[in-house]
Amino acid sequence: MAKMLKAAQIKQKANYLWRVGATGFSFASFGIGGVAIGGLVAPLVNLSTRNPSLRQQRTQKVIKHSFKGFTEMMVKLGIMTYDIEGLEKLQHSKQELVIANHPTLVDVVVLIGLMEQANCVVKQALWSNPFTKGPVQNAGYILNAGSEQFIQDCVKKLKTDQAASLLIFPEGTRTAKGELLNEFQRGAANIAIRAHVPIRPVLITCTPSTLTKNEKWYHVPSQSFHIHVKVLDAIQVDDLLEDATVSPKNVRQLNHQLHQFFNQELSKK
């Protein structure tokens, strides 16, 4: 019995070390991939056309396939599994505001890998990070500087004819471990009212919980974590607000309703 227990402990330890190593390898590969896209692929895309719109579309395609490849690599390494409910609603989404909760570090990677083309909001840290600034700037992603200009940039992007949908996480940061949802920042609601485009809710759950806010990447679970993505039907702003004119009151009301909606939907899981 003691030998069996010892063998089980050794196996458990080896499994943990494998997961830590595989996770570290995955994120190192992600960083190297960012440098490669910024230093090699992006310049080639720039040479392929003088049209800024085409450059952005092609860079977004490169990022989409890179993120899809990264997700599949993590699956092959046994780190994670995932499944999608309602993929067809997201895959070819156009001129929608796609909003999702944010439980893990890899949410944006998984979602962009699923969308044929996507515009995205990025933080200053990603905008200036040497590993990521090349790809995100070349792709025409929008810098979230917390200013009026940021809102205007998002609205302009969404109102462009046949524009790719805009992906945004209203929580603004990953959900704290043990919490269902952070408070929503008002940017998404503000953009939705001003652009007057459909809102596409996406629910993300991760079991067991990992890669949350303030959690070290090497604090890996004892088993593969599973990400479930559920894409819901689009919501029209007019269905949520009696008066959809732009005003601080309407922004607050829409923000509250969206947060309440996500809370209710996530509580069902």
Q: Which residues does each predicted region cover?
A:
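A generic structural signal for well-ordered alpha-helical segments
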Residues: 74-75, 136, 159, 192
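Short gly/ser/thr-rich secondary-structure transition/capping motifs
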Residues: 77-85, 148-149, 211-214
